[in-house]
Amino acid sequence: MDSQTVGILGGGQLGRMIVEAAHRLNIKTVILENGDQAPAKQINALDDHIDGSFNDPKAIAELAAKCDVLTVEIEHVDTDALVEVQKATGIKIFPSPETISLIKDKYLQKEHLIKNGIAVAESCSVESSAASLEEVGAKYGFPYMLKSRTMAYDGRGNFVVKDKSYIPEALKVLDDRPLYAEKWAPFSKELAVMVVRSIDGQVYSYPTVETIHQNNICHTVFAPARVNDTVQKKAQILADNAVKSFPGAGIFGVEMFLLQNGDLLVNEIAPRPHNSGHYTIDACVTSQFEAHVRAITGLPMPKNFTCLSTPSTQAIMLNVLGGDEQNGEFKMCKRALETPHASVYLYGKTTRPGRKMGHINIVSQSMTDCERRLHYIEGTTNSIPLEEQYTTDSIPGTSSKPLVGVIMGSDSDLPVMSLGCNILKQFNVPFEVTIVSAHRTPQRMAKYAIDAPKRGLKCIIAGAGGAAHLPGMVAAMTPLPVIGVPVKGSTLDGVDSLHSIVQMPRGIPVATVAINNATNAALLAITILGAGDPNTCLQWKFI
């Protein structure tokens, strides 16, 4: 494939997964890290690895002498040494030393983003003194965030100053660090977007995800984020623009806040693979690690290579953290191995409380199904989620990734169509419900039918009374199977609707059920879904 050798500064789990991706592409990797048991070195049995620190100029120069490209799995490296080795040898370094230097100082990162018109929380530089922190409280109010400018990750280096009485403790915790303060951002969710940038400056964003933190460490990631499509797209655009402002190629993790008023703010950026992107290994066309390797070596980056594997793919990433019990976290991994569509990734690290030991990816066509599997893996339920097992929990008809669209010409049809919705809920099938009239809103009907496959729908149930043109009109504009439900009217008892729907011309098929029989329409939709995906094939009987 490619004869380039990639040198990686840092040998942790991110380096390990970069190595895995590079090996599949026949790209040699050399690691700079202390010791021979670093996670990245464990899976790459070469004699060329450098035993040393990624902050040692001599070790960096030694690594550069063996490689064509240098990259990082951690931003806290000696960027001055990178600049010097690049001047001396001309070696390619991605991301650029300038970018790494800007990003690893979080206050400089904020100033850079502001300069480039990227929305961030208001912040200011502060001194390590009680008087300075009291001034911040007077300026921003309480609470506010006190942060270390450097060497801060996984919540380390952050302190919430809730009121004036917390200032002494904040100074003790962040003793002797360069600091800055940030105005409190009243967020409703934390989101993240992975963005990969090519050598020629093109950017490609992965789906927007939602991150859940516990004790300041990422605990779970929901992909895609449980927000509406507009917010998802706005987050991708914001992330793209933020990454475009930095020079150099590679993958970037962009963390952001979704505020209570709906605005988005960039929290911080990582110039490397990121914990919030681990789900991409199993849920996307190309993992964040392979995308990074492609970007820094100039390999092809085709359109849509950062998309989810299918339009309806849903995923949850669960971090495996070290606990108080030695190797106790591996009990959770064993449960994951018992769970269909759950993949375990361990990093080869010695257990320590709070340490990232690995992660688990759960992938399905339904977020509810992913959550059900997550609950078993975490031990909150003792029932192994078999393929045919479905809970009876109701799924809202406003699911962000529905598989079935339930439409009708008027809200007067809802009492009939709700019977079908209840069946879909019973079988835990995600669906959406909306009013689409063939006569009153024809343009909306056309857009709905045309866009349905792109949004991940697999089947449409259309209820209509009277002239009942809706099912046939929708079927004429979508490749999806359409099931028509004749709704009983006030004059001809629904026979007119039945005759209208069932007599579609050749080439425009519409499956037609009995008058008012939305129940059978839903069961037929479930059968269609099962036939198209054996992994989610449902077992049921007629009643």
UniProtKB/Swiss-Prot annotation:
Keywords, sorted A to Z: ATP-binding, Decarboxylase, Lyase, Nucleotide-binding, Purine biosynthesis
Residues where ATP binds: 137-192
Domain spans labelled ATP-grasp: 110-297
Pathway annotation from the record: Purine metabolism; IMP biosynthesis via de novo pathway; 5-amino-1-(5-phospho-D-ribosyl)imidazole-4-carboxylate from 5-amino-1-(5-phospho-D-ribosyl)imidazole (carboxylase route): step 1/1
PROSITE patterns: ATP_GRASP (PS50975)
Record keyword Nucleotide-binding present: yes
Pfam families, alphabetized: AIRC (PF00731), ATP-grasp (PF02222), PurK_C (PF17769), RS_preATP-grasp-like (PF22660)
Reactions catalysed according to its record: 5-amino-1-(5-phospho-D-ribosyl)imidazole-4-carboxylate + H(+) = 5-amino-1-(5-phospho-beta-D-ribosyl)imidazole + CO2
Domain of life: Eukaryota
Transmembrane segments: none
SUPFAM superfamilies per UniProt: Glutathione synthetase ATP-binding domain-like, N5-CAIR mutase (phosphoribosylaminoimidazole carboxylase, PurE), PreATP-grasp domain, Rudiment single hybrid motif
EC number: 4.1.1.21
One annotated GO biological process: 'de novo' IMP biosynthetic process
Molecular function terms, GO-annotated: ATP binding; metal ion binding; phosphoribosylaminoimidazole carboxylase activity
Family, as annotated: In the C-terminal section; belongs to the AIR carboxylase family. Class I subfamily.
Listed name of the protein: Phosphoribosylaminoimidazole carboxylase
Organism: Ogataea methanolica (Yeast)
Lineage summary: Eukaryota, Fungi, Dikarya, Ascomycota, Saccharomycotina
